[in-house]
């Protein structure tokens, strides 16, 4: 199972492997508190895309399409997919709105691959 959790939420044994999917380390969070097993910053949206989106809800649909294009061919997608096939994976993010975050797009892609 793959899920999303904010880095500010308490880690849980149910999280399985915790993978930070942010390009920048979250402000004010120590490595101990984040308790991430892996940091895949190269799977996060490009700085240009992140800046363009700026969590503007009106740009959400276009952001998803642009980010999916960036993910196309990214080998980390395959690695995360393989990791999830072996057990629980939690995508860790700092974004305030997990449902409209890059992790939500990534989760959708990974779930689609699982079902394919």
Which residues fall in each region the model found?
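Residues lining hydrophobic/aromatic ligand-binding pockets adjacent to catalytic sites
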Residues: 1-116
């Amino acid at each position: 199972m793959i899920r999303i959790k904010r880095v500010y939420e308490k880690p849980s044994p149910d999280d399985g492997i915790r993978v930070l999917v942010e390009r920048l380390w979250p402000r004010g969070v120590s490595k101990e508190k984040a308790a991430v097993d892996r940091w895949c910053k190269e799977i996060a949206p490009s700085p240009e895309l992140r800046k363009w989106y700026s969590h503007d809800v009106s740009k959400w649909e276009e952001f998803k399409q642009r980010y999916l294009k960036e993910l196309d061919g990214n080998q980390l997608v395959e690695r995360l997919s393989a990791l999830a096939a072996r057990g629980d994976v939690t995508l860790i993010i700092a974004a305030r709105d997990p449902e409209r975050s890059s992790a939500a797009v990534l989760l959708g892609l990974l779930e689609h691959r699982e079902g394919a």
